[in-house]
Every structure is written in C-alpha cells, then in structure tokens.
Swiss-Prot record:
Ranges of residues in domain Globin: 12-158
Native source species: Molpadia arenicola
Family indicated by similarity: Belongs to the globin family.
Coiled coil ranges: none
Protein name: Globin C, coelomic
Pfam families, per database record: Globin
One Gene Ontology molecular-function label: oxygen binding
Residues at which heme b binds: H74, H105
Length: 159
C-alpha cells in the first residue's frame, strides 16, 4: 500500500511543476555547498536541538558552520542525494531511494516534525537564493514536490 500512495502522490505533480523544480534545482546547484549549508543553519536557528543530531557540528556558530569541513561534506552529501530525488520525481524508483533515507533518519530519531521544519526552511532558502525567480509557480511546484517526498518518507517511517 505504501508504494501505491507514493506513486499516486507523484502523479499529482504536473510535468510543468517537475520542470520548474528541476530547472531551479540546477540553478541552486551552482552554489550547492553554500545553499545546503544555509538550509541547515536555518534549521539549527529554529531548532537548536537539531544541531545535536550532528555531534561533529554540535555547538558551532553559524559562521563556524559555514567554514566547517564537516558541514561542507554534509552539504555535498545532501545536495547529491537531493539531486537524485529531483531527477527521479517521476520515477517508480523514488520510493526506494527515499526508503534508505527513512532508515537513516529512523536511527537518528528524525521524524515528521523535522520534515515539517525542513520544508519551511527549504522554502525560505529557495526564496532567498532564487530571488525574483521564486514566484508563485515556483513556490507551488516546490511545495508539491516536497509534499510528495515527505509523504513517501512518512509511509516508509510507518507514521
């Protein structure tokens, strides 16, 4: 049943929305390390306890995080993973790709509240980075794409 829900949710994302997500993602990947680092700095600002899930980065200030090799390495991993998801938005493979992430997040006690915060922060970071390219269609496309990803993750978590 989980796979069916995921595939059905993917069907709700239009071809035009997928194109917008892919186009803007490619724009963002020109500065992937700084973009993803900014996302995590925003997460840690909203929820300082989330930073403790990364022992190697616990207690670092925003400026320390920006120059941290650990944060840069994590940003590269996250941007690579997200690039896979963006490319596979219309693929039956997406739920399986997300299952691996769900297992890792389960081990680190990352759940629905964290995904909701990530969605909020991602939208803020998208708007800040894309500027005037972040219009209503872009916002709607990203909101829908993230809702697809989040729905699959929550099914894989068993929530």
């Amino acid at each position: 049943m989980g796979g069916t829900l995921a595939i059905q949710a993917q069907g709700d994302l239009t071809l035009a929305q997928k194109k917008i997500v892919r186009k803007t993602w490619h724009q963002l990947m020109r500065n992937k390390t700084s973009f993803v680092t900014d996302v995590f700095i925003r997460i840690f600002a909203y929820d300082p306890s989330a930073q403790n899930k990364f022992p190697q980065m616990a207690g670092m200030s925003a400026s320390q995080l920006r120059s941290s090799r650990q944060m840069q390495a994590h940003a590269i991993r996250v941007s690579s993973i997200m690039s896979e998801y963006v490319e596979e938005l219309d693929s039956d493979i997406l739920p399986e790709l997300l299952a691996t992430l769900a297992r890792t997040h389960d081990l680190n006690k990352v759940g629905a509240d964290h995904y909701n915060l990530f969605a909020k922060v991602l939208m803020e970071a998208l708007q800040a980075e894309l500027g005037s390219d972040f219009n209503e269609k872009t916002r709607d496309a990203w909101a829908k794409a993230f809702s697809v990803v989040q729905a699959v993750l929550l099914v894989k978590h068993g929530n």
